[in-house]
Swiss-Prot record:
Binding sites annotated in the UniProt record for Zn(2+): C981, C984, C998, C1001
This protein's domain notes: The CysB motif binds 1 4Fe-4S cluster and is required for the formation of polymerase complexes.
Domain of life, per lineage: Eukaryota
NCBIfam families listed in its UniProt record: pol2
GO molecular function: 3'-5'-DNA exonuclease activity; 4 iron, 4 sulfur cluster binding; DNA binding; DNA-directed DNA polymerase activity; nucleotide binding; zinc ion binding
Note: In eukaryotes there are five DNA polymerases: alpha, beta, gamma, delta, and epsilon which are responsible for different reactions of DNA synthesis.
GO biological process: base-excision repair, gap-filling; DNA replication proofreading; DNA-templated DNA replication; nucleotide-excision repair, DNA gap filling
Species whose genome carries this gene: Caenorhabditis elegans
Keyword tags: 4Fe-4S, DNA replication, DNA-binding, DNA-directed DNA polymerase, Exonuclease, Hydrolase, Iron, Iron-sulfur, Metal-binding, Nuclease, Nucleotidyltransferase, Nucleus, Transferase, Zinc, Zinc-finger
Protein's name according to its UniProt entry: DNA polymerase delta catalytic subunit
Cofactor requirements of the protein: [4Fe-4S] cluster
Top EC class, one word: transferase
Signal peptide limits: none
Length: 1081
């Protein structure tokens, strides 16, 4: 009789398991409530910041480092007008958090005063613009329809200033009157819109004000430029010059909150005493959530089960807080505080309380911007926990998540999340690594291995529910995993000096650190330009952005290479800071650009090789050359300070500064050439590259003219020959035999050739290559010498050893071959190794991890013009298992598998794990033809000639190939596999299909069995070693290995050996009970 009860069907066990799973995932709190009858008291010792000195601001001045800058709009009322306040968040020297509110700053813009406009017209102009703004506010429904006349008259402020347009030289002293309009950001926005239609400035009817100036400049950038405050710089407020707010008056959670007028701020240069860094607090976090089977966790349904946190003070070696908020019971973790929570609501509330208590300046982690933080905030919404979103320093403002599309040449196009955590900087390590480094893979495991030589256990989200459902020991393991994921980002920040480098970049360019993390490259140069313009009374015009399809310009010169393998030393002459030096030497700037020649050529103006005209230094010193001179001088000082400094942390700070200065100097040229930018000026960028091309050609001619055979008192054994030149360097063969001789002549050549150029343009000699393999333009390799005794490194440019668009096998093989060619100088050994690798590839002896190619999934398949291998594979993987399939922004690893002839490449791409599990044969011919052959041929052509590729891909080493039998696809689904004899491989009759061997091989059965057992023991030993290696990596000596790190070669080895072991075990089972009769004599 069939039961009517729910779940009483024949599928009852499956339904029961599903129901239990759903109940656990959706409402599994009761079990943990039983385990936690009372929530333990949280140990907050050491969380809070130091106590505030009561004399600060009263009898002692307040000095603080500014980390974050915000503006907020304050609406006017019946007795006051709109204003824009600026909040500066920072840290004092003693480690107290502070919020400085500047209440008397007004943003502004300019327009050129109309003919006849004078001081007597200011009142009329102000009244006209104020009335326009008031009318616009009424139309906008701002709720201020009946503003009193006094308030309306003060919506904006108008005054006359004198200056000139940044673009073009018009004479030595051509300052003209401009109208400056100041007010709140909202008032200025409405004024800017209304001015397009004309305004009655002089009481004689509407006047078209023409082009506006600086109306498109970010308010924060404008404020910092006006006050000379720089991002991450130090300011000081003298004692008694500010108003200290009481706790009831504070709008922020900072320990100190003051209001101060702009005039009372003392701004310090980032040198000497003020070059240091305050005790900045960095919080690194990682979350774990429990998803449903086959579905990646979704915040609307899937709860957070753990949040790991580490807090570190910049400059200290180790974190001073290590804790993990855990849902349920959890065994202790050495060195960490485990905070057990009865349910997810308690977990989130207590974690948010922890963040507010520890009060970090920087929040970091790996992919926290696009996953961890949005997930936490979304869960808080689902659970109706508004206080959890209050993670910032503003009391009444919660954190908000938005989508932010960014597009740049450096990072490509992508959509990130933008999160406002007021007063704190979100420093996502993933975003920093994406911006600053070109890697094959950007998983935390891969990046950690790249920079720290350390790996971590990578647990798939499908395994996390099992660990959470287990006991306190399995949850302890999950906590260890979570803590490691929070710890590694801190290690990476220290190793890469990312925070120090970004602090110094903020100081050099003047913009807040947050701008460097979230905005493009141009904001840095724009900030420096704006500051210099303020000092010299230049105004930046608003340039309408175009589509970027304007005409380009000719780039740098590349002297055609004389290709070959050079056993003799090749000297390299480099121009020091070429493009900045050209701009300084020839006074190239917006302010010196001429529409037509004026005066005497080379005295009053110069004509550049590209046909543009610029005023000489005698007429006007350009702003860009002044900026660049200051940057290069500051870099020289920073390098000297670094050289003389004994303290390691201060040395790191100086190194970060000199790197920031170097990057900034090299960015100025690109800023002028950006057609889609704030201040494009192709005349400058065209002239710079034209001068560069001319100088490379001049260098070639001069070197070959001076260093003839017998020159330099007979030290030149042959005529010098420039074999290659590229952008800012030339490679010269002087015909000498030793590196020391090449260095001596190279130093002399740099000194002599520099004489023909205008200072500060200077040739420098730094290195010699010996030997040198010149393959083509921008493709070469050689041993790099800066001292004559021993080489510094093997330097490769443009070769597959440093490129990411090939599989790792290519880089590995080319690297070994180059070592044999350049270091061992054994050409035959290099060729033999290449042939041996090709043979191993065709015989399926190459580990699959070396054949994986990965590409980023930046958009869905229908948005690509042609089908892409990684996009099509991602779609197939989604159909198999949507939960583990790659998502937008992920890098998709794939290999090429064998298929029928003429099947396109995008259909032959497959997931490496799927290939291993199903024993799918790889397309080794594709790897040889499309990946390995041409790169190898390129490095062997200078040695073997045009036949290099034929020698490599044909011959005895390519005749033996291994064919793998696939378990899926092709004919595998339509064929039945017949049992074969394990001895002679003959097909067994159907009646004997369960036997291990045929009748002819039965006498050899013990020998065959022993051989197969040996094979299985070898595989077991191999698997055991791999398993132990993974346990050591995960620090779990006795637990099961759950790691599935796709970037780790051990993972693929382990999976391959696991499959081989399974097949070997099946073979052993065919022998039945191992009781064999000894053969009769």
């Amino acid at each position: 009789m069939t039961s009517k009860r729910p779940g009483g069907s024949s599928f009852q066990p499956e339904v029961k398991r599903k129901r239990e799973s759903d109940e656990f995932e959706q409402c599994y709190v009761s079990r943990f409530e039983n385990e936690l009858p009372s929530v333990p008291t949280i140990d907050k010792t050491g969380w809070a910041r130091p106590a505030v000195d009561k004399d600060l601001g009263i009898s002692k001045s307040i000095a603080c480092q500014i980390l974050e800058v915000e503006t907020y709009h304050e609406d006017g009322s019946a007795t006051s007008y709109d204003r824009t306040n600026v909040k500066l968040y920072g840290v004092t020297k003693s480690g107290n958090s502070i919020c400085v509110i500047v209440t008397d700053y007004f943003p502004h813009f300019y327009f050129q005063a109309p003919q006849g406009f004078g001081v007597e017209h200011i009142g009329t102009a102000q009244s006209a613009i104020c009335n326009m703004v008031a009318a616009a506010k009424r139309r906008g429904g701002s709720g201020q329809a009946q503003l009193p006349g006094k308030v309306v008259d003060n919506l904006v402020h108008v005054e006359i200033v004198h200056g000139e347009n940044l673009y073009y030289f018009r004479g030595a002293d051509t300052k003209v009157p401009f109208v400056k309009v100041s007010g709140s950001t909202e008032a200025l926005h409405k004024a800017r819109m209304e001015l397009k239609n004309g305004v009655n400035l002089m009481g004689k009817g509407p006047v078209n004000v023409g082009n506006l100036y600086e109306s498109n400049i970010n308010v924060i950038v404008m404020f910092l430029a006006k006050t000379n405050i720089v991002g991450c710089g130090w300011i000081e407020i003298p004692a008694g010059k500010c108003r200290i707010l009481s706790n009831s008056e504070k709008s922020s959670r900072c320990q100190i909150e003051v209001t101060v007028p702009v005039k009372n701020l003392i701004v310090h240069e980032s040198d000497g005493e003020w070059a240091g860094i305050a005790p900045i607090r960095t919080l690194s976090l990682d979350i774990e959530c429990i998803g449903r089977r086959g579905v990646f966790p979704e915040a609307i349904k899937d709860p957070i089960i753990q949040i790991a946190n580490l807090v570190k003070i910049e400059g200290e070696a180790e974190p001073f807080v290590r804790n993990c908020f855990v849902l349920g019971t959890c065994a202790p973790v050495v060195g960490s505080n485990i905070i057990q929570c009865v349910n997810e609501k308690v977990l989130l509330e207590k974690w948010a309380e922890f963040v507010r208590e520890v009060d970090p300046d920087i929040i970091t982690g790996y992919n926290i911007l696009n996953f961890d933080l949005p997930y936490i905030l979304d869960r808080a919404k689902v659970l109706s926990l508004p206080q959890v979103s209050h993670l910032g320093r503003q009391k009444e403002k919660g954190s908000v998540v938005r989508d932010a599309a960014i597009s740049s040449k450096q990072m490509g196009s992508r959509v990130n999340k933008s999160i406002d955590i007021h007063g704190r900087i979100i420093f996502d390590v993933l975003q920093v690594v994406l911006r600053d480094y070109k890697l094959r893979s950007y998983t935390l495991n891969s990046v950690s291995y790249q920079f720290l030589s350390e790996q971590k256990e990578d647990v798939e989200h499908n395994i996390i529910p099992d660990l959470q459902r287990g006991d306190e020991q399995t949850r302890r393991r999950l906590a260890q995993y979570c803590l490691k994921d929070a710890y590694l980002p801190l290690r990476l920040l220290d190793k890469l000096m990312s925070i120090i480098n970004y602090i110094e970049m903020a100081r050099v360019t003047g913009v807040p650190m947050n701008f460097l993390l979230t905005k493009g490259q141009q904001i840095k140069i724009l900030s420096m330009m704006l500051r210099r313009c303020k000092q010299n009374n230049f105004f930046l015009p608003v340039i309408e952005a175009n589509s970027g399809d304007g005409e380009g310009y000719e780039g740098a010169t590349v002297i055609d290479p004389i290709r070959g393998f050079y056993n003799e030393p090749i000297a390299t002459l480099d121009f020091a800071s070429l493009y900045p030096s050209i701009m300084i030497a020839h006074n190239l700037c917006y302010t010196t650009l001429l529409k037509s020649p004026q005066g005497v050529e080379n005295e009053d103006y110069i004509r550049t090789p590209s046909g543009q005209y610029f005023a000489t230094k005698s007429k006007r010193r350009g702003l860009l050359p002044e900026i660049l001179e200051d940057i290069l001088a500051a870099r020289k000082r920073a390098k000297n300070d670094m050289k003389n400094e004994k303290d390691e942390f201060k040395r790191m700070v100086y190194n970060g500064r000199q790197l920031a200065l170097k990057i900034s100097a090299n960015s100025v040229y690109g800023f002028t050439g950006a057609t889609v930018g704030k201040l494009p000026c192709l005349e400058i960028s065209q002239s710079v590259t034209a001068f560069g091309r001319k100088m490379i050609d001049m260098t070639k001619l001069e070197v070959e003219r001076i260093y003839k055979k017998g020159a330099l008192d007979g030290k030149c054994p042959a005529d010098a020959k420039v074999i290659y030149g590229d952008t800012d360097s030339v490679m010269v063969k002087f015909g000498v035999e030793t590196v020391a001789q090449a260095m001596e002549i190279g130093l002399d050549a740099a000194k002599e050739v520099s004489k023909i150029f205008t200072p500060p343009i200077k040739l420098e000699f730094e290195k010699v290559y010996s030997p040198y393999l010149l393959i083509n333009k921008k493709r070469y390799a050689g041993l790099y010498f800066t001292k004559p005794d021993v080489h510094d490194k093997m330097d490769c440019k443009g070769l597959e050893t440093v490129r990411r668009d090939n599989c790792p096998l290519v880089a590995k093989v080319l690297g070994v071959c180059l070592e044999k060619l350049l270091i061992e100088r054994d050409q035959q050994s290099a060729l033999d190794f290449a042939k041996r690798t090709i043979s191993d590839l065709l015989c399926n002896k190459i580990d699959i991890s070396l054949l994986i190619i990965s590409k980023e999934l930046t958009k869905s398949g229908d948005k690509y013009q042609a089908k892409q291998a990684h996009v099509e594979l991602a779609a197939r993987m989604k159909k198999r298992d949507a939960g583990s399939a790659p998502r937008l922004g992920d890098r998709v690893p794939y290999v090429f598998v064998a298929a029928a002839k003429n099947v396109p490449a995008y259909e032959r791409a497959e997931d490496p794990t799927f290939v291993l599990q199903n024993n799918i044969p790889l397309d080794t011919k594709h790897y040889l033809t499309n990946q390995l052959a041409k790169p190898l041929a390129r490095i062997f052509e200078p040695i073997l000639g045009d036949r290099a590729e034929k020698i490599l891909v044909e011959g005895e080493h390519t005749r033996v190939r291994t064919v793998v039998q696939s378990k899926v696809g092709g004919l595998a689904a339509f064929t039945t596999k017949s049992a074969t004899c394990l001895g002679c491989k003959s097909v067994l009759p159907r009646a004997e299909s369960e036997n291990a061997v045929c009748k002819h091989c039965e006498p050899k059965l013990p020998t065959i069995f022993a051989s197969r057992m040996n094979t299985m023991h070898e595989l077991e030993n191999h698997f055991g070693r791999l398993w132990t290696e993974c346990q050591n990596c995960a620090k779990t000596m006795q637990d099961k290995v759950n790691c599935s790190a796709r970037d780790c070669p051990i993972y693929y080895m382990r999976e391959k050996v696991r499959n081989e072991l399974s097949e070997a075990s099946a073979v052993i089972e065919r022998f039945g009970d191992p009781c064999f009769q000894a053969p009769t004599k």
